From Swiss-Prot:
Its main location: cytoplasm. GO terms for molecular function: iron ion binding; N(6)-L-threonylcarbamoyladenine synthase activity. It comes from Sulfurisphaera tokodaii (strain DSM 16993 / JCM 10545 / NBRC 100140 / 7) (Sulfolobus tokodaii). Substrate binds at residues 132-136, 164, 185, 264. SUPFAM superfamilies: Actin-like ATPase domain. The gene is kae1. This is tRNA N6-adenosine threonylcarbamoyltransferase. Its cofactor is Fe(2+). Pfam families: TsaD. The lineage of its organism: Archaea, Thermoproteota, Thermoprotei, Sulfolobales, Sulfolobaceae.
Amino acid sequence: MNVLGIESTAHTFGVGIVSDDDSEIRILSNERDTFVPKQGGMKPSDLGRHHSEVAPEVLQKALIKANLSIRDINYIAVSLGPGIGPALRVGATIARALSLKYDIKLVPVNHGIAHIEIGRFTTRSKDPLILYLSGGNTIITTYLDGKYRIFGETLDIALGNMLDTFVREVGLAPPYIVNGVHQIDLCANKGGNFIELPYIVKGQDMSYSGLLTAALRATKNNRLEDVCYSVREVAFDMLLEATERALALTGKKEILVVGGVAASVSLKTKLYNLAKDWNVEVKIVPPEYSGDNGAMIAFTGLLEARHGVTIPVEKSIIRPRWRVDQVDVTWRLSEN
C-alpha cells in the first residue's frame, strides 16, 4: 500500500509518501515548501497563493524521491484541519482533483493527530502523555477509550504563536529560525537577568496573551536579551507546571513532545530535568518531523486506511477548528 499525504494547514505546503509493503512501514519521501513573509505576520491570502504556486513542484519532487508515479498511489490522505482556511483549501482541492482524476480513495486526516502519530512512530512511544506544541496549538493530551483526551491547553494564544509574535514585534524576525535555532533562544542565551512577567496557569491550562503583552512593554525599560530570557523561562515553566499536574493525574511513564516547538533545546533541557524528578522518559519527535510536513499526513492516512477510514470527495470539507479530541482514533483500539 502506498499513501500520499498532503499538508497545507498553515505556512507549509508538504507532500509525503509512505509505504507498508512487506508489513514494514517506510517513509519514502517528505518534500515541502514553507512560506516566509518578508515582513509582518502571515496573511491567509498569501498562504493560499504560495501553496498554489509551489504545489506542482512539491508533488513532483515527492513522487520522484519515492520512485513512484501517481498511478502507484493507493490512497490520498489530506489534512482537512485545523488550520487557516485559504491554506487548507489549496491542499483539499488538490487532493480532490487527484482522487477524481486517478480514481484514488481519499482519507481525511486531522493535522494535530498526525503530529501525534508521527511522533509515536518515530520515537516508538507506547502510551505517553503528549505535549503538542506548535504555532497554533498548545495541548497536553493522552489516549483513552478511542480518543485523545485533552488534559490541558492554552486558553488563548499558542506557545509557538506567542514566541513568534514576540520576536517579530521586537525586530528579531523574520527569519524565525536560524540554523535550526529559534530567535527567542538566540536572544535569550545572551541574557540572564530575570524580569518578573505574568505567570498564568489555571489547573492544567495556560494563558500566554498576558505574557506577550507584558513582555513587549518590558522591552522599553530593559535589555532585550534579558526580556527574551525571561519570556522563555516563564513560558516554558508554565508548560512544565501543567505537565507535572497531568503526570500526577494520569500516572504516565512517558512524555512525548511533538510540534514545531519540540525543536527548542532549552525546552528539552527543562523536560529532561523534570523527567528525572518524576522517573519518566522523555521522547521528542525528530527535527525533520517536528514542523508541518506531508509524511505525517501520509503516515496517519495509512493507519486510517488500514481500518477502512475513507470519505467521498463531496464530503471532504475543510474543518479549520477541528480539535484532536473530536477524532475517533479507530486504529488504536486494536493495540489494546
